[in-house]
Swiss-Prot record:
Protein name as it appears in the record: Protein-L-isoaspartate O-methyltransferase
A GO-annotated cellular component: cytoplasm
Stored Gene3D superfamilies: Vaccinia Virus protein VP39
Example GO biological process: methylation
UniProt GO MF annotations: protein-L-isoaspartate (D-aspartate) O-methyltransferase activity
Keywords: Cytoplasm, Methyltransferase, S-adenosyl-L-methionine, Transferase
Function: Catalyzes the methyl esterification of L-isoaspartyl residues in peptides and proteins that result from spontaneous decomposition of normal L-aspartyl and L-asparaginyl residues. It plays a role in the repair and/or degradation of damaged proteins.
Alphabetical list of CDD domains matching this protein: AdoMet_MTases
Catalytic activity reported: [protein]-L-isoaspartate + S-adenosyl-L-methionine = [protein]-L-isoaspartate alpha-methyl ester + S-adenosyl-L-homocysteine
Location(s) in or outside the cell: Cytoplasm
EC number assigned by the record: 2.1.1.77
């Protein structure tokens, strides 16, 4: 699976946004254990600098989370890559993302040609993400809503990616996962979180495994404009 995103020259940028800097990030991710080449290529292609404030552009291709306002962050590239790699293992076509944030995770998945639905509770962040998707020519379906409710009318989903941590997996989201599907989400509180992978088998059984220790912002209820 190869990234389908074809960027205009003005979207690529120069200096710290150059291809050489992106290649170095990909090399670091590979050294850190990311092995799926489709995932690495998507990270290389999607311009992370467009998803953060210009004041932080020089740090866009560091393997670190960065603030995006409203108490939220753009996830560390390794985490984005690990979650993407995990869901690609089930060959999904339709993916739900809970917590659009900057839009970067959705863009990485969208660059792989997947059908993406993403839900964000903070209206201002969602409006900014929509502008970025349009600028990149990406047809990503978005919704301003409480992410804990998912997007049932478009379910079930082959894969679900949750980008904020809850004390336990949210039953409403698990219920929107198709047979043979995979949900990847951070689980835990301020004292410690784990990236958890949940698979719904064809016989209806559920299997879980822990992928890695992580740190995410909390998954909150309600909506903000």
């Amino acid at each position: 699976m190869s990234p389908r995103l074809r960027l205009q020259p003005e979207a690529v940028g120069i200096g710290m946004t150059s291809q050489r800097v992106r290649d170095r990030l990909v090399d670091r991710l590979r050294e850190a254990g990311i092995v799926d080449e489709s995932t690495l290529n998507a990270i290389r292609v999607v311009p992370r600098h467009l998803f953060i404030d210009e004041a932080l552009a020089s740090r866009a291709y560091e393997d670190t989370a960065l603030p995006i306002g409203h108490g939220q962050t753009i996830s560390q590239p390794w985490v984005v890559a690990r979650m993407t790699e995990a869901v690609l293992q089930v060959s999904p076509k339709k993916v739900l993302e809970v917590g659009t944030g900057s839009g970067y995770q959705a863009a990485v998945l969208g660059a792989l040609g997947l059908e993406i639905y993403t839900v964000e509770r903070i209206g201002d962040l969602l409006r900014q993400a929509r502008k970025r998707f349009r600028a990149l020519g990406m047809n990503i379906r978005t919704k301003h809503d409480d992410g804990r409710a998912g997007w049932a009318e478009h379910g079930p989903f082959d894969a679900i990616v949750v980008t904020a941590a809850a004390p336990a997996l949210v039953d409403e989201l698990v219920g929107q996962l198709a047979e043979g599907g995979r949900l990847v989400a951070p689980v835990g509180g301020p004292g410690g979180q784990s990236l958890v992978q949940l698979d719904r088998r064809a016989d209806g059984s559920i299997e879980q495994r822990v992928l890695a220790p992580v740190t995410f912002v909390p998954l909150l209820s309600g909506m903000l404009d």
